[in-house]
Amino acid sequence: MFEQTLTSDALVTTTHNHAAEPTQRPLRDSVQQALRNYLAQLNGQEVIDLYDMVLSEVEAPMLDVIMQYTRGNQTRAAVMMGINRGTLRKKLKRYGMN
């Protein structure tokens, strides 16, 4: 569904610029455009569980990139994400990344 990639530079820029101007949101803009494209391709078909679908499309690659960046260090990855380690472990298990 989402065919756009997030570079590590973009992730770092996005992370460090929480107070960035509204026009400087490459990740948000990419997700928004991908959603528009997806909905346009539906041709009026009903969508069920869109929230869960979008979340998994964003969350799984994010977890993959962060786990690579931290070289598998779950504690460091959890701190980076602002979640506790147990939550991270559940998410990794959900996507078969444990």
Curated annotation (Swiss-Prot):
Q: Which residues bind DNA?
A: 74-93
Cysteine pairs bridged by disulfides in the record: none
Which residues span the membrane? none
Superkingdom of this protein's organism? Bacteria
InterPro entries with a match to the protein in the record: Fis_DNA-bd, Homeodomain-like_sf, HTH_Fis, Trans_regulatory_Fis
Q: Which SUPFAM superfamilies match?
A: Homeodomain-like
Q: Which UniProt keywords apply?
A: Activator, DNA-binding, Transcription, Transcription regulation
This entry's Gene Ontology molecular function terms read: DNA-binding transcription factor activity; sequence-specific DNA binding
Q: How does it assemble?
A: Homodimer.
Membership in a protein family: Belongs to the transcriptional regulatory Fis family.
Summarizing the function annotation, the protein's role is: Activates ribosomal RNA transcription. Plays a direct role in upstream activation of rRNA promoters.
Could you tell me which NCBIfam families the record lists for this protein? PRK00430.1 (NF001659)
The protein in question is named DNA-binding protein Fis
Q: Which organism is it from?
A: Aeromonas hydrophila subsp. hydrophila (strain ATCC 7966 / DSM 30187 / BCRC 13018 / CCUG 14551 / JCM 1027 / KCTC 2358 / NCIMB 9240 / NCTC 8049)
What does the organism's lineage look like at the top?
Bacteria, Pseudomonadati, Pseudomonadota, Gammaproteobacteria, Aeromonadales
